[in-house]
Amino acid sequence: MSEASDLDPKAVRLQFARRTQRLAGADFLLREIERRMLERLELVRVQPALIVDAGCGLGQGSVLLQQRYPAANVLGIDVSAPMAAAAAALHGMQARRSMFDRLRQLFGAAQPGAQAPLFVAADAASLPLPAASVDLVWSNLAWHWFTDPGALLQEWRRAARGGCLLMFSAFGVDSLRELRDIGVSTPRFDDMHDIGDWLVTAGFAEPVMDAERMTVTWESPQRLLSELHALGGNAVRSRGKGMRGRHFLQSRLDRLAGLAGPDGRIALSVEIVYGHAWAPAQRPLPPGFSPVHFDRGGGRGKP
């Protein structure tokens, strides 16, 4: 069972709504991990008809998945309506079409292969999709924005068709530890072994988890703080409310400056967790066999 999160879902939506225009200039790590995930995907044989990009942001990953699988329908889902609209506009979609119009196109009479992804503002933990309809669930570095990982995986399992591949990346527990050491709060990052257990509990099979560590550097405290804010900021319930003064900001910049190395750059540790698992396919019965259904009622049937 996953632990309760300190994330405020309303704050998550507001943070990303405010940062829609700033994300594109600060998403270098998202794009790099996306590239590495796509390399891993090359090793897997799948021919998905419906792909869900959970936590799609500005939709770059959705577009690359559409290019990889041109016959598939790709649905980019983000909890922020302004973010989903910006993704649609960025990639030439009509940003103002309603979610129901989009889903009607997806499950209606349209021919397979949508040419471009559909972008929908929705909760990835409550997908606007029927059960057993998705062939590939993809999520790139959005895990720490989901408030209940166990419930999230159960929802993805509900939507997954038999044989569906789940592929995702997440920040590991050692990410940004230098910030925590100087008293700067960070989101809660889950241990990959816990994630593996949650996958099994949710009903996924053959989970594979691994991690890699890297160091990311910034040229100044101001640049580091700006990019971290652009990537989502602080959305925990325990965050301070109201406006922070100039002295608070300067104190934070001074603490960050203390992390600088001899070259003046600030280095932070990042642990990237990769995971994939499968929704078990329903096994066909051997020839000549048929299912037997038992009536558990108390009455006796007629002979």
Predicted regions located by residue number:
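A short acidic, Gly/Pro-enriched loop at the edge of an enzyme's catalytic core
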Residues: A125-L136
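N-terminal, positively charged/glycine-rich alpha-helical extensions of SAM-dependent methyltransferases
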Residues: M1-G25, R31-R35, G301-P303
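Conserved alpha-helix/loop element of class I SAM-dependent methyltransferases that forms part
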Residues: L30-A49, Q60-L64
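Conserved Class I S-adenosyl-L-methionine
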Residues: E212-P303
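A short glycine-rich, Lys/Arg-flanked "PGG" loop and its adjoining helix->strand segment in the class I
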Residues: G150-G162
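Conserved catalytic/acceptor-binding region of the Class I
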Residues: R161-R223, A230-G245
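A short SAM/SAH-binding and catalytic strip from SAM-dependent methyltransferases
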Residues: D135-T147
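Class I SAM-dependent methyltransferase SAM/SAH-binding core
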Residues: L50-L127
